[in-house]
Amino acid sequence: APLHTMLNAGVTVGLGTDSVASNNRCDLIDEARFCGLIHRAESRDFKWPDADRLLSLATLDAARALKLDASIGSLEIGKLADLVVIDLSRTHGTPVHDPAASIVFSAEAADVLLTVAGGQVLFEGGELKTLDEQALRDAVNRALTRMS
């Protein structure tokens, strides 16, 4: 859908992912990047949407779309402590002139160092902290085998 048209009409737009069944990847950085590139090419305005707008679509605007902006979507007193720490020092992301642009247009999932949701560390040092990733993969594969 044309992002500019929806935003001008007052539609609350948020970016997100649903499952690999429909999109092959659950990577919100990719979603923001593709949203920006697609709409820049479509509008021929190669500066719109800018990286700040794309990050907002993936964070606070997404929370607004879900009517959860009172508790998530931005770092504010009283909201849940949800955050992601991204390493922008790797060669594919340097030099960093604009951190938002570096996140949206250069970062990738492998650059994520830490993920915290509701104040709980979920991912750190390349490992899921609250799930047994191998057990989860095994369960998914067993379910897939039963459905085949």
Predicted features and spans:
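His/Asp/Glu-enriched, well-ordered alpha-helical/loop segment
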Residues: 3-90, 106-107
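Short, exposed beta-strand "edge-strand" segments with a Pro/Gly-rich flavor and a Y/T-containing core
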Residues: 1, 24, 43-49, 94, ...
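Active-site microenvironment of metallo-dependent hydrolases
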Residues: 56-148
